[in-house]
């Protein structure tokens, strides 16, 4: 929030130094706002690979949903590049990084970073946007669902690069931007058209084995990220040759395309079969995705909280306070809440609420537009609010 002025200024100074050291934005793979570039190539090829690899015994429902996805291909491409242009994004793209060995982005692992650490990572963003995509798909909102799926695949592509899973930023190395440019200029020669097998063979069948979506997604991403990180140290740093970089781009871009095909395959099976990733599972964390109204002065600098009450009468409440400015007019903010009781099921939670508390005597009102709560990879609450919340107030969302 804005009241965190000191560390916000530190973060701004870091952002300034980062931009000063790079001639372009700090992307992992390149992507243009119009849905072109390396990220768009990856998702386009991912769909093409899956189509080429479909075995004859794939269910008709999966084939039908693949056709719907293809009809919305431009939305997939737009979603795949959007996170690099999102006005709500962190200035240093902290949530586009994820070290598969530490489970952190560079805001926790890199010694030069002195501002508030960012809890979101490239890996957690994959799961969040995948959950939103499944939710909208199951409601028949295919265009929005495909855009969300594209966003998920953007982050998947990011953590497959050599630099992002190694938590090497443009502050750490000029190679970050140079390698991205190198790959973008040669991306056509790195396209692949198959994962090397049909969907009734091991690579694809293994993808469907673990019904726990969150656990599967994290470990699936980890495998590809580990390859990317390893390639950074063996072939993609500034000390390596152009031939090394060519090898690094070839391997990691092929992995991005193959991995994307596999992830989309899992998505299509989940929506085709109506799989519920939350059934019978304990809830260890809740993810809130809050949209603030675009109406003038809808944002707030007051303290904001999220709380729950379980059927046994116990309550838990968290402050919602991301580094930098959140709850701004038109913003979309994400918060992750760890539950004290890890034995809870989602049905054990009786009530949920958001609460506003004055920061000063002269409080400003706040107008949230919508809040979605995600548990175990499923949207469990979708609440349209569109009401002004004034003073010290509580708004029940469940």
UniProtKB/Swiss-Prot annotation:
Stated consequence of mutating residue 364 to N: Increased dependence of PLC on Ca(2+). Dramatically decreases hemolytic, cytotoxic and myotoxic activities
Protein known as: Phospholipase C
UniProt binding sites for Ca(2+) 3: 300-301, 325-326
Residue ranges occupied by any PLAT domain in the UniProt entry: 284-398
Catalyzed reactions per annotation: a 1,2-diacyl-sn-glycero-3-phosphocholine + H2O = phosphocholine + a 1,2-diacyl-sn-glycerol + H(+)
UniProt organism field: Clostridium perfringens (strain ATCC 13124 / DSM 756 / JCM 1290 / NCIMB 6125 / NCTC 8237 / Type A)
Biotech use, per record: Vaccination of mice with a fragment (residues 275-398) protects them against a subsequent challenge with purified alpha-toxin.
Cofactor(s) required, per the database record: Ca(2+); Zn(2+)
GO MF: hydrolase activity; phosphatidylcholine phospholipase C activity; toxin activity; zinc ion binding
Subcellular location: Secreted
Binding-site residues for Ca(2+) 2, renumbered to this chain: 321-322, 324, 326
């Amino acid at each position: 929030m804005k009241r965190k002025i000191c560390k916000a200024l530190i973060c701004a100074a870091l952002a300034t130094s980062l931009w000063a050291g790079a001639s372009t934005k700090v992307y992992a793979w390149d992507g243009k706002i119009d849905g072109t570039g390396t990220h768009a190539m990856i998702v386009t090829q991912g769909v093409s690979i899956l189509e080429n690899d479909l075995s004859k015994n794939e269910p008709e429902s999966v084939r039908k949903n693949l056709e719907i996805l293809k009809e919305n291909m431009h939305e997939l491409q737009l979603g795949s590049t959007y996170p690099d242009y999102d006005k709500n994004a962190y200035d240093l793209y902290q949530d586009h990084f994820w070290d598969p060995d530490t489970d952190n982005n560079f805001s926790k692992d890199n010694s030069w970073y002195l501002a508030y650490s960012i809890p979101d990572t490239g890996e957690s963003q994959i799961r969040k946007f995948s959950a939103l995509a499944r939710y909208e798909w199951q409601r028949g909102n295919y265009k929005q669902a495909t855009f969300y799926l594209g966003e998920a695949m953007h982050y998947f592509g990011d953590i497959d690069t050599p630099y992002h899973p190694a938590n090497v930023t443009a502050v750490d190395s000029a190679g970050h931007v140079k390698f991205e440019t190198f790959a973008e200029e040669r991306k056509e020669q790195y396209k692949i058209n198959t994962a090397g097998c049909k969907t009734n063979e091991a690579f694809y069948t293994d993808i469907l084995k673990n019904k726990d979506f969150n656990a599967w997604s994290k470990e699936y991403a980890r495998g590809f990220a580990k390859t990317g990180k390893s390639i950074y140290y063996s072939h993609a740093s500034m000390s390596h040759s152009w031939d090394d970089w060519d090898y690094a781009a070839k391997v990691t871009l092929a992995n991005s395309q193959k991995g994307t095909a596999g992830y989309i395959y899992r998505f299509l099976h989940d929506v085709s079969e109506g799989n519920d990733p939350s059934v019978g599972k304990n809830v260890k964390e809740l993810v809130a995705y809050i949209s603030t109204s675009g109406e003038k002065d809808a944002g707030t600098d007051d303290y904001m909280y999220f709380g729950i009450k379980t059927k046994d009468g116990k309550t838990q409440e968290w402050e919602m306070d991301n580094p930098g400015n959140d709850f701004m007019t038109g913003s979309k903010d994400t918060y992750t809440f760890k539950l004290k009781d890890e034995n809870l099921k989602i049905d054990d939670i009786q009530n949920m609420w958001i609460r506003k508390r004055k920061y000063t005597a002269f409080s400003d009102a706040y107008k949230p537009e919508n809040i979605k709560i995600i548990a175990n990879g499923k949207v469990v609450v979708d609440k349209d609010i569109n009401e002004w919340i004034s003073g010290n107030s509580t708004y029940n969302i469940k």
